[in-house]
């Protein structure tokens, strides 16, 4: 929850409304199941040192990247870092159960409640509070661990804005949670009545007065609070804000009328101080005041008792109202003595007012006050926990796993009730659906030009997806972002395969380009490798072509392609792109390693493929190799090349088994290397090498669409505000 509070604080202090566009904030929780399905290694998160540690839960601070990606155009915002919080287990319980110093106050069951990441994301809206449902929000989570060392990696999770904005809130489903917390608190006060401060006992009595006679309920109430059970068994109904507001207004009016009646009664029957001590009693006051008075005050108060005390619900001992012969309002037995050992009737008052405030006090405010005492102060997190909370379950379109959208009663973010100036935004999907239905088409792209212009006039935010030529992504498609990256992987892989095929056609003979001493006992192995070389190369090319995006995104080819594309854009006066993880210049090969901040002569990044069994890529990061002594290595004429040696850079520390061998040093690997110009080197065992040059031709706009997603365009700031409208790249 601390991540939600911090993000909302930044959001509240930011100028998040600029011109025709504005940003709202939505709080989400991504459970372990969804994180795992997105490719996040939870071991790195669960094994990390906790940022917070309490008697109830611990959490880890996570720096997460956030980027808004426009529908169809390929334009996107700069990456911004926001604070996320990962709770290893019991995430929803940590959200919904107040944190106090004594864990015995609330009984919880965390067995089915997994860990989760708490994060807040921006929603882009127009001036009429409408959003494009196909605009995406990218969440980038760091994934580096001991196996990758200085190489920084990450995983992306994509959400469409339609996924992040539910049609309503579910505060009505939170009633059972609050009722359970109230009952557990009352059970705690009754069990430890003799040990707790009088203030806590009095607050417990106030709370009990608000919710009625709960003794039987407390004894029958289960000691376990299971939020997962509540989520699984809710009514799946959304709130009706108009009805709720009307009921609240009616209740306020009724309470004010009752208060006026109480004031009138007090004036007609003021406190009397003439009663004998032998008939000491407490009547006509509220139950919570009576308990404190009965237990702790057997002395007569001074005669100048203020009428304010009566209005606060406390009848001082010795001051009794409505007592006299034949008076039907007497509430205590006439046999009650000054020790007050027996109370023969119940105290029935249930309303209370705290002076000097004229606002009626409700059960949640009483509960919050008690939590503040039990928790050494009222924290903002406990303020939110003690109020109503809405949890809406959603299904992530990519992973098909559940995540939660959270709204807090005391929040100004999406679904919050603190600000009536920010109603929930509405989706433009309705406008598009009506247009498609009227014209009998199944996709907005097939609408007539006249209808597209009309929609763009009504909603300018849809103008580019509908009318702009040469969009880089498919318009109005939830999978367009994934399609762009798959298209990039496919295109660059095909370029590599074509280049290698052309090189083999031009020069089918392979030469030993890396110097290794071959002994006589190696000759049988060399002969066998020679016989298998065509199959090895064919299998390697198939592995490159069929590689998944997850494998491709951690390899040498994508890193070299980024260097090539960034250098190309920068050469012709475009943006200066930087590596996302390290802030190194993107055109520097190997810039994802922290220490590579300048160009290193002879550096080539390699991927290692297995020669035994299925041919698969083995490395989880590019393997940097420096080729020494090569003269015109990439020349197409082999007789112009010289034999060279290769070494690891001094800053590279191998971790995986394959990383401990240089290219050609082991019979177990075929190594494919790339430099910043997309030159290719396939190294077989014993140093035999095939070289090729990739011809990568892509439109500049498409290159920049990919680079703006994979890289940064400015240095990381210390204070980052992703919720401020900005110019798109």
Curated annotation (Swiss-Prot):
Disulfide bonds: none annotated. Its main location: virion. The keyword Ribonucleoprotein does not apply. Keywords: Capsid protein, Host nucleus, Late protein, Viral genome packaging, Viral release from host cell, Virion. GO terms for biological process: chromosome organization. It comes from the Viruses. GO terms for cellular component: host cell nucleus; viral capsid. InterPro entries: UL17-like (IPR007640). It is found in: Virion; Host nucleus. Belongs to the herpesviridae CVC1 protein family. Interacts (via C-terminus) with capsid vertex component 2/CVC2. Capsid vertex-specific component that plays a role during viral DNA encapsidation, assuring correct genome cleavage and presumably stabilizing capsids that contain full-length viral genomes. This is Capsid vertex component 1. It comes from Gallid herpesvirus 2 (strain Chicken/Md5/ATCC VR-987) (GaHV-2).
